[in-house]
């Protein structure tokens, strides 16, 4: 077990975590749940991080982290700071319209072409209610077609074309499975980016 933990720790993006004031010792002592979520590409629970400001002072703030890869496949770390509210005008990367911000605030998942690190890709966007930050993942990173096939096989149901299209657009679909109401759809807080809610 200890060996497994050590191997997993070796894969942590230490240089990226150090920017947030989490040195190797602190990273190794993170709770296992946090390390596992980081390694799996999931969004971590809220944690305190310290950042060196340009004026030399240290700013400590709560945020969630998520490990991903850049366009070259190198590890990258996304930080979702806790905010009082979604400030859609300040987020230049996502370039949200007021209408998109309102949809996110209502809990909707939206799909949008986003320019990240010079690469324009289709992304799913979802507002994290705890941090008021927008979580985003490439549409291609969420193996949606496979998730839908797996769900159909396991639950012995067949989704119609319209239902599949709704899910692709980020809208949840309510189904009746074995006499039980179930909602399925995109959830970027989940590792696989997809959730079945009973």
Task: Kindly label every feature range from the protein language model.
Residues 1-198:
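Gram-negative host-targeted secretion-system effectors, predominantly Type III and Type IV
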């Amino acid at each position: 077990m200890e060996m497994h933990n050590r191997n997993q720790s070796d894969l942590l993006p230490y240089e990226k975590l150090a920017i947030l004031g989490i040195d190797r010792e602190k990273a190794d002592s993170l709770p296992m749940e946090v390390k596992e979520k980081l390694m799996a590409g999931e969004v971590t629970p809220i944690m305190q991080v310290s950042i060196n400001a340009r004026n030399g002072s240290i700013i400590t703030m709560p945020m969630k982290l998520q490990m991903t890869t850049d366009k070259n496949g190198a590890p990258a770390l996304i930080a979702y700071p806790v905010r009082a509210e979604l400030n859609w005008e300040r987020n230049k990367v996502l370039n949200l319209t007021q209408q998109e911000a309102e949809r996110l605030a209502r809990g909707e998942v939206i799909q949008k072409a986003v320019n990240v690190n010079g690469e324009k890709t289709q992304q799913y966007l979802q507002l994290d209610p705890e941090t008021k930050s927008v979580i985003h993942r490439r549409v291609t990173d969420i193996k949606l077609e496979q998730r839908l096939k797996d769900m159909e096989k396991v639950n012995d149901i067949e989704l119609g074309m319209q239902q599949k299209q709704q899910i692709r657009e980020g809208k949840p679909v309510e189904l009746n499975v074995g006499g039980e109401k179930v909602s399925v759809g995109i959830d970027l807080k989940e590792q696989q980016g997809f959730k079945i809610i009973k």
